[in-house]
Amino acid sequence: MTGPELESSGRNYLGFLEGDDGYCSFIRFTGEQLRVYGEDPLFRNLSMCSSGVYLSLVTDGDRLSFDCRTLELVSQLLPAIAELGWDGVKEIIRGLSKKIEQGAPLPRQREKFDLVTDDGQRISRMPKNGHLYFEFRNGSRRAMKLRLYFPVFPYVALRRLESNGRLEPGTATLPRILCLGDSITQGFNAVHPSLTWTSRLADLLGVDALNQGVGGYYFDAASLEGLEGLAREGPSRPALVTVAYGTNDWDLVPGLSTLRERARAYFARLAGLFPGVPAYVLTPIWRGDLDKPKACGSFDEVARAIAEEAGRYPGNRVVDGLSIPIQDRKYFQDNWLHPNEEGFRIMADRLFCAIGPARAAEPGSCDGSDVASPGSGLPVAAPAPR
């Protein structure tokens, strides 16, 4: 596949970069947002990861392969976005080499590429510098629909995507949702990018999910800069938005009044960007240290403050994070903060109940078995109880 074919295959991204060497990568944020995240080395790195991005493909072969490069960040990349826009970035990305200085360490790499077939096969490979291949069952050599999910970490690029059969970009266009949040939204510790809560929720709703989670982040109205283009009427406009901040605010913000001010400014900016678009605001989920005192107040006080600030806008639906039944360390990959795949599954199911069908009259009350089949479409939901 050529660069333009890769670009047309991509889903859940806002920027596409291709170097003279043919390596292509996908960016989840606007240039304005990347300027904000670029002020901190950790946020800069995490914002450049391709979390949630996948390629939609069709092949009658049974093998897929490509050249992969795991890239750290170019020191000139963020200034170029700020000063030159995407054209400047495309110039800088040309000839990008493997050895690029990294400003801050990424989390330990565990995440993989996932190739998911339309009959439920999932084949995973760790990203590395070199050639990757995926083999899957397709004995009848039918035209099989595939999704190649990019890893949550690190920042990767690929070229020479090939199959041993005919290979084309997928043509299906799905409605889009926008997922805003921290590391839990980004998908920390999921291992399989197709099994984060955002990917699972998108499958349940029959949509694509632009994942704008950034690990360690918090309520910051500036992080919404540059989304005006996404907010305009058209296919890029999200059908709904999810917002899931608060756990880092509880750790970092010096006082509850400051948190309220930041959340208030954030929700005001969000409402101004997406009038008429429902926003599902997930208050912080359970964590293993929620009983410890913090300068910002108790965990319950923070959750209540977020719910109250979100409630100022009629388009916001508040979902109580503590109502999600993962209040046990067995649902957490790190034993206390970041859910594992089962934890993410439960999160997605419960959020689907909050968003979804009329039979979930009390969002959060349905159990994991009471979930509509994937691809059921994007239903209209009433506000979640506060």
Task: Please describe what each predicted stretch is.
Residues 196, 220, 340:
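Residue-level signal for threonine
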Residues 138-140, 150-215, 224-233:
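Serine-esterase "nucleophile elbow" of acetyl-processing enzymes
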Residues 1-177, 354-386:
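N-terminal secretory targeting modules
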Residues 211-221, 251, 336:
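Acidic/histidine-rich helix-loop elements
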Residues 61, 224-386:
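Alpha-helical cap/lid subdomain in secreted, periplasmic
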Residues 66, 210-213, 281:
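A structural signal for short, well-ordered beta-strand segments and their strand-loop junctions
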